[in-house]
Amino acid sequence: MQRDLADANSTITAVQGVRVGHWTEHRALTGCTVVLCDGRAVAAVDVRGGGPGTRETDLLAPGRLVRRIDAVLLTGGSAFGLAAADGVMRWLEEGGLGYDTGVARVPIVPAAVVFDLGVGDQHVRPGPDAGYAACEAASAAPVAEGDGGAGTGATVGKWAGPQYAMKGGLGSNHIDPNARLCMSSAVTGFMSTYGVDEPAGTFTDL
């Protein structure tokens, strides 16, 4: 199930300068999603879970030298999927983007993973080419949510064991209270569940 918001855009691309792109492999049930921030953006993160897989999230802590990011990557493939960030960095570098170190521009791309290796084909994982393709696909259109990109193999409800897993997905939102703008994007392996239909939210309702 995939939800496209064609009317009012309540996704993060409603924020000026934000573009989102997906790379999706439906047969292998994996993918990645990139959020590009034109002009760079201040970001924060809250890392949770018993086995988080992240890249460059430590630099988002207060007091770090680099205060702004160029993109965020959410990816399937567990820790292997972090390689997709290399493709995002390559795409940004080709555009002359990144943190100016004085000798080179280094694109800042925090990334986080979803463990989806047990859902589809464990041998197919997002890599550098997938991250690059997600950047090429990025646009300011309303974000296609649910089953796509990093949400393709996302699951929830596994506390009692993987046999109880239900289909997850990807969602995003933006909030503009009193001109203080916030935006968020989450893979619903950590947040709420999208696409649960019959039978009982299994992958057969894709």
Describe every region a protein language model picked out.
Residues 1-206:
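Alpha/propeptide regions of enzymes that mature by internal proteolysis
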